[in-house]
Swiss-Prot record:
Its main location: membrane. It comes from the Eukaryota. Belongs to the CorA metal ion transporter (MIT) (TC 1.A.35.5) family. Magnesium transporter that may mediate the influx of magnesium. This is Magnesium transporter MRS2-5. Has the ability to complement a mutant in yeast lacking magnesium transport capability. The keyword Acyltransferase does not apply. It comes from Arabidopsis thaliana (Mouse-ear cress). The gene is MRS2-5.
Length: 421
């Protein structure tokens, strides 16, 4: 008999099976499945949204970007993007990150980088006003070739602060125009309708005070921390990164040039090689000197720009603090009106108590008079009751006595200062 062959040996398997690697599935077309069958589908929560991009020249464009693209483009964590979602209500905040500034003030929510501003494509009037005003300012500076001391990110941040402060101040002025007439009317006419109106206005005042106080605290927090202000200077960090990259590139080119001049075996040793090596050393020394000089200039410019940012924040801090002072004055006026109303209500209550006291004294005197007259209404056998004129004298004397008694009560109350003199 011939040699039996193992039907399960690798040599007897078909070519298309033996050529596949173990552990990799095979499809019916002879191709391996290298990915998830639904790799083309987007992950949940990665839907695209409309964003408005404004560059340094004032040109705006609408972009369709998803959350992951924004995070990668601006180097932001996902929690910072939640501040930009108009569906959620978050307190006002200004966050400085490595490559961007996340701003959420009032209804203006945007991402500011060293080159562009990205904001939600909302139809809110504040966002539309911010977009048009920023584009107009940037385009005017670009057309007139005006060089401003403030970098791009500070210009965008300044406009956000300006519009937010104007919006808050307008809300405060509107509330003042509505509150003062109502309080004056309430001081003269205390009614349930006026009290309910003042209660609603006081709720609006409390909400607006919290919003203004949050903006004021956020600006003050930035002013108190120099590191946060330095972190917000994106243009300087970008220039330093580019300078550092160019220095590394020069160093690498110098090292390659030096190694090619020294290690070359095909060319004979000549003064040219030594010259190239000396040139590489000189180039590296020059680049190190230039790098140290640039770092010194960058550090000094950071200090100057921190001062610029601090002055910018301080200016708007004064504006917000003035708005907060208006709200405090308005709250004090409401408290004074409430105190006046309580005084008036207390006065009315005292008058009611005085009237009740007089009525009680009159009731006591009338009860005495009624008790005396009731005696003559009894069926008693006495000579006094037989004389008709006696009853008239008794009534007269009792009435005069009750009058003197009531007058004595009034004098006693005045003596004890229960009644005003």
């Amino acid at each position: 008999m011939g040699e039996q062959l193992d039907p399960f040996s690798a040599s007897n398997l078909p070519d298309f099976i033996s050529s596949q690697k173990i552990g990799r599935p095979v499809n019916f077309e002879g191709q391996t499945n290298r990915g998830h069958p639904f790799s083309g589908l987007k992950k949940r929560g990665q839907s695209s949204r409309s964003w408005v991009k404004i560059d340094q020249d004032g040109n705006s464009a609408v972009l369709e970007l998803d959350k992951a693209t924004i995070m990668k483009r601006c180097s932001l964590p996902s929690r910072d993007l939640r501040l930009l979602d108009p569906l959620f209500i978050y307190p006002s905040s200004i966050l400085g990150r490595e490559r961007a500034i996340v701003v959420s003030l009032e209804k203006i929510r945007c991402i500011i980088t060293a080159e562009e501003v990205i904001l939600m494509n909302a139809r809110d009037a504040s966002v539309v006003q911010y977009q048009s005003e920023l584009c107009k300012r940037l385009q005017s500076n670009h057309n007139l070739n005006v060089k401003d001391d403030l970098p791009f990110e500070f210009k965008a941040l300044e406009l956000v602060l300006e519009l937010s402060c104007l919006s808050l101040d307008a809300q405060v002025n509107e509330l003042e125009m509505e509150v003062y007439p109502v309080l004056d009317e309430l001081a003269t006419n205390i009614s349930t309708l006026n009290l309910e109106h003042v209660r609603r206005l006081k709720g609006r005042l409390l909400t607006l005070t919290q919003k203004v106080q949050k903006v004021c605290d956020e600006i003050e927090h930035l002013m108190d921390d120099d590191d946060d202000m330095a972190e917000m200077y994106l243009t300087e960090k970008k220039e330093r990164a580019e300078a550092h990259a160019s220095e590394e590139l020069e160093d690498n080119i110098g090292e390659d040039f030096e190694s090619s001049g020294i290690v070359s075996k095909s060319a004979p040793v000549s003064p040219v090689g030594s010259t190239s090596g000396n040139f590489g050393k000189l180039q590296r020394a020059f680049s190190s000197i230039v790098g140290s000089h640039k770092s010194l200039l960058s550090s000094s410019s950071i200090g100057e720009n921190i001062d610029q940012l601090e002055m910018l924040l301080e200016a708007y801090f004064v504006v917000v603090d003035n708005t907060l002072s208006k709200l405090s004055s308005l709250k004090e006026y409401i408290d004074d009106t409430e105190d006046l109303i309580n005084i008036k209500l207390g006065n009315v209550q005292n008058q009611l108590i005085q009237f009740q006291l007089l009525l009680t004294a009159a009731t006591f005197v009338a009860a005495i008079f009624a008790a005396v007259t009731a005696v003559f209404g009894m069926n008693l056998q006495d000579s006094v009751f037989q004389n008709p004129t006696t009853f008239q004298y008794v009534l007269l004397i009792t009435g005069i006595g009750c009058g003197f008694l009531y007058f004595g009560f009034v004098l006693y109350f005045k003596h004890k200062k229960v009644f005003p003199l």
